[in-house]
């Protein structure tokens, strides 16, 4: 007897909708589109090419909408693709708008770099977050191929490590050697330690206390 395939359950992300009353009647928005009206972008997943493209598109839209108003980027991310993260980073520096960053939950790896890359004085964290910095990882469970190709990838990884360290150096004020030592292994910090290290500017508990 041939077993019949059973339908598999797939996780579906539930996206809330909000309804606003306008002069023309009711208008429905998914929550992320509604937040975008208030210049809020949410990075709540691992950093992938698709996520980067979406965030970059939102930043460009908000820059065109009003280049004088800041963009608010909320981050809860374990990190992800270095190239995708650097694409977001480059556009954070490219757009005319200030970019305020907010850590909620966790900002690890590329997530911490994006948190730190916010406009100086506008990098926030809630009090119970975790921030983690480390050197870039070689993706995949193993490495195979010609020795020459392995050497090429190893050299590229070293260049990437130096590039990321230099970016942290630019935004934290820490010297290169201190950062290199701090990033040698997974380095977890609470937000107060991250503030002391220069990764963020303010630890906030409520909107009533923006500076802490």
Swiss-Prot record:
It comes from the Bacteria. Its main location: cytoplasm. Its EC number is 3.4.21.92. GO terms for molecular function: ATP-dependent peptidase activity; ATPase binding; serine-type endopeptidase activity. InterPro entries: ClpP, ClpP/crotonase-like_dom_sf, ClpP/TepA, ClpP_His_AS, ClpP_Ser_AS. Pfam families: CLP_protease (PF00574). One of its GO terms (cellular component) is cytoplasm. It catalyses: Hydrolysis of proteins to small peptides in the presence of ATP and magnesium. alpha-casein is the usual test substrate. In the absence of ATP, only oligopeptides shorter than five residues are hydrolyzed (such as succinyl-Leu-Tyr-|-NHMec, and Leu-Tyr-Leu-|-Tyr-Trp, in which cleavage of the -Tyr-|-Leu- and -Tyr-|-Trp bonds also occurs). Keywords: Cytoplasm, Hydrolase, Protease, Serine protease. GO terms for biological process: protein quality control for misfolded or incompletely synthesized proteins. Transmembrane segments: none annotated. It is found in: Cytoplasm. The active site is at residues 109, 134. NCBIfam families: PRK00277.1 (NF001368), PRK12553.1 (NF009205). Belongs to the peptidase S14 family. PANTHER family: ATP-DEPENDENT CLP PROTEASE PROTEOLYTIC SUBUNIT, ATP-DEPENDENT CLP PROTEASE PROTEOLYTIC SUBUNIT, MITOCHONDRIAL. Cleaves peptides in various proteins in a process that requires ATP hydrolysis. Has a chymotrypsin-like activity. Plays a major role in the degradation of misfolded proteins. Fourteen ClpP subunits assemble into 2 heptameric rings which stack back to back to give a disk-like structure with a central cavity, resembling the structure of eukaryotic proteasomes. HAMAP family: ClpP. This is ATP-dependent Clp protease proteolytic subunit. It comes from Bdellovibrio bacteriovorus (strain ATCC 15356 / DSM 50701 / NCIMB 9529 / HD100). The lineage of its organism: Bacteria, Pseudomonadati, Bdellovibrionota, Bdellovibrionia, Bdellovibrionales.
């Amino acid at each position: 007897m041939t077993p019949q395939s059973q339908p598999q359950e797939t996780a579906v992300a539930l996206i809330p909708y909000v309804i606003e009353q306008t002069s023309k009647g009711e208008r429905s928005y998914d929550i992320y589109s509604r937040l975008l009206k208030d210049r809020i972008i949410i990075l709540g997943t691992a950093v992938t090419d698709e996520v980067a493209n979406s965030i970059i598109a939102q930043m460009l839209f908000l820059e065109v909408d009003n280049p004088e108003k800041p963009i608010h980027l909320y981050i809860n991310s374990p990190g992800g693709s270095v190239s995708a993260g650097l694409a977001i980073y480059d556009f954070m520096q490219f757009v005319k708008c200030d970019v305020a960053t907010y850590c909620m939950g966790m900002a690890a790896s590329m997530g911490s770099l994006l948190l730190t890359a916010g406009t100086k004085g506008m990098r926030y964290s809630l009090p119970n977050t975790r921030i983690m910095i480390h050197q870039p990882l070689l993706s995949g469970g193993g490495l195979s191929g010609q020795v020459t190709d392995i050497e090429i990838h190893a050299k590229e990884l070293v260049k990437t490590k130096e590039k990321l360290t230099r970016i942290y150096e630019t935004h934290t004020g820490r010297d290169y050697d201190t950062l290199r030592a701090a990033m040698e292994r997974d380095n977890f910090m609470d937000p107060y330690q991250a503030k002391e290290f220069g990764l963020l500017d303010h630890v906030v508990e409520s909107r009533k206390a923006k500076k802490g």
